[in-house]
């Protein structure tokens, strides 16, 4: 999960400025629904910037939750062709809060139309038993990604990659 570390009030202020600049859609919504134009813009960006394996044959459609404010669509870049984060650098500095939030909104919107990541998950369980105590099972899982899918667009710098060792049953 990507976090910018902003407080909600600050985030809404930044989003309000992006909305007033015409860069994002209305931000006071919890809808996850995208318009047909937004889906097309996302899929166009994917086909122009990623391999064909990153674009599913059909659009990914998400329905709103029961209590969602369905009057508005999801927060997303505005327009029928999105301004890319790189294009936004002509008017906003890379370290500006507006740029950071816009990039998050752009990447999340586009990633919602990409194929899933694929990987191999390995789980190691260690059972500790002692006659004086009850048994305890420790478990750890790790995934080796074989295809990045949407993860090729959304990369969390804080996410650490650590491969689990190959162990056989009864290894100590």
What are these regions (language model features)?
Residues 1-172:
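Core catalytic DNA strand-manipulation module of type IA topoisomerases
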């Amino acid at each position: 999960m990507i976090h910018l570390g902003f407080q909600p009030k600050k985030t809404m202020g930044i989003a309000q400025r992006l909305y007033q600049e015409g860069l994002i859609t209305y931000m006071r919504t919890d809808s996850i629904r995208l318009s047909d134009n937004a889906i097309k813009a996302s899929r166009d960006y994917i086909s122009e910037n990623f391999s064909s394996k990153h674009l599913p044959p059909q659009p990914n459609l998400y329905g709103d939750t029961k209590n969602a404010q369905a009057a508005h669509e999801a927060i997303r870049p505005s327009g029928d062709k999105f301004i890319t984060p790189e294009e936004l650098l002509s008017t906003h500095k890379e370290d500006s809060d507006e740029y950071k939030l816009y990039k998050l909104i752009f990447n999340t919107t586009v990633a919602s139309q990409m194929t899933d990541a694929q990987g191999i998950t390995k789980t190691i369980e260690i059972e500790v038993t002692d006659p004086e105590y009850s048994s305890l099972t420790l478990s750890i899982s790790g995934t080796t990604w074989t295809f990045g899918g949407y993860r090729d667009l959304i990369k969390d710098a804080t996410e650490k990659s650590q491969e689990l060792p190959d162990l056989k049953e009864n290894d100590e």
